[in-house]
Swiss-Prot record:
A motif ('KMSKS' region) lies at residues 236-240. Its EC number is 6.1.1.1. Belongs to the class-I aminoacyl-tRNA synthetase family. TyrS type 4 subfamily. Homodimer. L-tyrosine binds at Y36, Y162, Q166, D169, Q184. This is Tyrosine--tRNA ligase. It comes from the Archaea. InterPro entries: aa-tRNA-synth_Ic, Rossmann-like_a/b/a_fold, Tyr-tRNA-ligase, Tyr-tRNA-ligase_4, Tyr-tRNA-ligase_arc/euk-type, Tyr-tRNA_synthase. The lineage of its organism: Archaea, Thermoproteota, Thermoprotei, Sulfolobales, Sulfolobaceae. It holds the Pfam family tRNA-synt_1b. It is an enzyme of class 6 (ligase). ATP binds at K239. HAMAP family: Tyr_tRNA_synth_type4.
């Protein structure tokens, strides 16, 4: 695979690369690059996470040595699953199982547990050094990476450790690339700034889009005056808002019901969850999407790329109901092997029930 091909694969469907020039230089160096994503085991896996899962798959295929950090302690600090570490660890196992059955070759991933990292005194020394090189105001601004607002830091002082831990994860693992959703931008920018002060390697940040919740843009009125990345974090699909999300363990019928009830105004692309599912989840997996229609309405039509489909939708050539039916059909095809895998393992069924009762913000 050429450098241009690797670059195209790595950047496909990314919301932001900081910076593209630095990424190209790293690829041109011909050194084996190391990347990572850290995930909080915080509940059921919804389809929004498939966006970064696909990007992990892309990075592995592009020859990047990827680390998957099971951020158990981070989830504990963030009060996920009621702060129950045993349940958090179960959720981590479940998440890795989903990633595997999505099609990521987990044998090519370096899977790291935060539980192991925090046992090392060098790790905590690094956390302190990072904190010493960041202002308190900057740390508090970065709390949005946890789904928290700056003022919420007063609730529990441990929250202030979180951003320094995330930056330390990056330095401790000696990474070239940090992958995350756009809600992780503040942490990655903090890592880049602190790297200069500490003489550490400056990461390239790859930010994937946050999938808007099924309610779409209907909640935009509450986001006035917020920064763009914070707006996207506010309206994203969230496991703590089950009505806004499709979970990978949902039945075929539930997926169809949720898709058919989702926000999808005729001719509108902005904050349209159905179009986003097609763009970020379905088209990266399939070469085409078929819209089945009665012959009275033009008959079946196929689209080989997302841009062509979006244009047709904006121009009113595709009805929302037809779009939703096609989306539900393709999405269920993607989710079927994941569902079957989870059904084959009773421990995951029991865990899903426990997690469903324990999901916190």
């Amino acid at each position: 695979m050429s450098i241009d091909q690797r670059l195209q694969l790595i950047t496909r469907n990314a919301a932001e690369i900081i910076t593209i020039d630095e990424l190209r230089k790293k690829l041109e160096s011909e050194e084996k690059l190391k990347g990572y994503i850290g995930f909080e085991p915080s509940g059921l896996f919804h389809i929004g996470w498939l966006i970064w899962t696909q990007k992990v798959k892309d990075l592995v295929e592009a020859g990047v040595n990827m680390t998957l950090l099971r951020a158990t302690w981070h989830a504990w600090i963030n009060d996920k699953l009621g702060g129950d570490l045993s349940l958090i660890k179960m959720a981590a196992d479940y998440t890795v199982e989903v990633i595997k059955n999505y099609g990521v070759d987990t044998t090519k991933l370096n899977i790291v547990d935060a539980d192991d990292m925090v046992k090392e005194k060098d790790y905590w020394a690094l956390v302190i050094k990072v904190a010493k090189n960041a202002s308190l105001a900057r740390i508090k601004r970065a709390l949005t990476i946890m789904g928290r607002r700056a003022e919420e830091a007063e609730i529990d002082a441990s929250k202030l450790i979180y951003p320094a831990m995330q930056v330390s994860d990056i330095f401790y693992l000696d990474l070239d690339i940090a992958l995350g959703g756009t809600d992780q931008r503040k942490a990655h920018m903090l890592a880049r700034d602190v790297a200069e002060k500490m003489g550490k390697k400056k990461i390239v940040s790859i930010h994937t889009p946050l999938l808007v919740g099924l309610q779409g843009g209907q909640r935009m009125s509450i986001t006035e005056g917020m920064e763009e990345d914070d707006i996207q974090a506010e309206i994203k699909m969230s496991k703590s808002k089950p009505e806004s999300a499709i979970f990978v363990s949902d039945s075929r019928e539930d997926v169809e019901r949720k898709i058919m009830g989702a926000y999808c105004p005729k001719g509108v692309a902005e904050n349209n969850p159905i179009l986003q599912i097609l763009k970020y989840i379905i088209f990266p997996r399939y070469n085409f999407v078929k819209i089945e229609r009665d012959i009275r309405y033009g008959g079946d039509v196929e689209f080989k790329d997302y841009e062509e489909l979006e244009r047709a939708y904006i121009e009113g050539k595709i009805h929302p109901m037809d779009l939703k039916k096609a989306t539900a059909r393709r999405l269920n095809e993607i989710l079927e092997p994941i569902r079957k895998s989870l059904e084959r393992k009773p421990e995951f069924e029991e865990m899903i029930q426990k997690i469903s009762k324990s999901v916190t913000r």
